[in-house]
Amino acid sequence: MKEYNKSSKLEHVAYDIRGPVLEEAMRMRANGEKILRLNTGNPAEFGFTAPDEVIHDLIMNARDSEGYSDSKGIFSARKAIMQYCQLKKFPNVDIDDIYLGNGVSELIVMSMQGLLDNGDEVLVPMPDYPLWTAAVSLAGGNAVHYVCDEAAEWYPDIDDIKSKITSNTKAIVLINPNNPTGALYPKELLLEIIEIARQNDLIIFADEIYDRMVMDGHVHTPVASLAPDVFCVSMNGLSKSHRIAGFRVGWMVLSGPKTHVKGYIEGLNMLSNMRLCSNVLAQQVVQTSLGGHQSVDELLLPGGRIYEQRNFIYNAIQDIPGLSAVKPKAGLYIFPKIDRNMYRIDDDEQFVLNFLKQEKVLLVHGRGFNWQEPDHFRIVYLPRVDELAQIQDKMTRFLKQYRR
C-alpha cells in the first residue's frame, strides 16, 4: 500500500496546548483515571454557564438560522459589533469591515492565509498564544518572536521589536490582554508599538479576546483606537466573556486606512466566501451579548469567582518555594516561573508530562507558548478555590523530587 504522510506545509506547525501531553491525558482518561484539565480556558468545564438571555436568544432564533448567511455574517451581529467598535473609538469601521468567524481561531488562520507569501515575516510575542505562530507557519511565513519582559510586567521589549524588523516583515501581532501571562498593556506602550508599525509600514494584528475580562479597576485600550492612520486587524469574540466557547463566536474588524490594502481585503473576502459562512445560530446571540448587562463583570469584581480564584492561585504560587509569577491583570491564566537554580528541570514538556502522570493534573509547558527557556508553565485559574488548593499541594509535593 502507498504510504501517506502529513503535508510538508505542517512541518513547522505546532500547537502544544493540544499536543503530546494532552494525548497522554486522553489515554489516562480512557483508562478510567480522573484528570483535572488545565490546558485550555474552557469555562463550561468548570461550572461557568452562559447568561440566560443568550440561551433564550439561541432558542428563539433556531428556526431563522437554518440557512446560510452572508459570508461575513448576519447583519444584526455585524451591526452590534460595529456599535461596540464605535464605543471603543475604533476609527473608520463600516459594517463591511467586520467578519464573523467560528471563533477567533478560524479568523487568525484566515488572516494569515490571505496575507503571507513564502518567506514573509510576522513579529509575534514571546510567549505567545501558539496558534499565531502556527498560523504564520501554515501560511508559508516565518514567525519572528519578540521578547516580552517578565521583569517589566511581561510588557513587550520595544528595542527587541525594533531589532527584529527586516525588509521581509509584514506585520506585528499584539495579544492584549495577554495569553498566557495575563498582562495588560498601557496606552503609552501601545503608542510606541504603533509608531514602530507606522514607520515600517506594518499591519497590526490585535488579539483582544480578553478585553472584557480585566480586573482591579484597570481599563483595556484597543490598539485600533490609538491608530487612526495605521491599518489594524482586531480579533475578538464571546467564548470567554460569555462562557460559550463551544458556540464558536468570533469576529475580525478592519480599521484605519484601507486604500493600500485593497488586495489583502480581496483575499480575505475570497477566503471568507470559500467557507460559506460561520455558524449562523451562534451569530444570533451577538447582538444580545454585546448590549445591556454584562454578567462577566460580576465575576471579575472582589467576591466574584474569577477574581477570587486569580488571587488565590497567585498567592499560592508565591508560597511554593522556587516558584514566582507576575500577577495577572486580565484573562484566565497565570504563567509561573520555576527557579532552575533550585530545581533540576531541563525539559519543561517532560516536567508537565511527569506532573500529569503523578498528580493527574494537565498543564501546558512554557515552550508550548514559544517561550525560550524550559522554566515556565501555564495554569488556568478557572477551577474553584478548593481545587486550586489541591493543585498547590500537588505541585509542592511534586517539585521536591527535582530539588538540587
Regions found by a protein language model. Give the residues of each.
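N-terminal small-domain helix-loop-helix segment of the aminotransferase-like
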Residues: K2-K6, E11-G103, M110, C277, ...
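Helix C-cap/helix->beta junction micro-motif
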Residues: N31, A139, Q199-N200, V230, ...
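PLP-dependent enzyme catalytic core of the Aspartate aminotransferase-like
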Residues: L87, K162-S163, R344-D346, N354-L363, ...
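Conserved PLP-anchoring active-site segment centered on the Schiff-base-forming lysine
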Residues: G114-V136
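A short helix-loop-beta submotif of the ANL/AMP-binding
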Residues: L138-V144
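Active-site phosphate-binding strand-loop segment of PLP-dependent enzymes
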Residues: V144, D149-H220
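Conserved core segment of the aminotransferase class I/II
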Residues: S225-G304, Y314-A316, L399
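Conserved glycine-rich beta-strand-loop-beta hairpin in the small C-terminal domain of fold type I
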Residues: Q287, G303-I317, A325-D339, E373
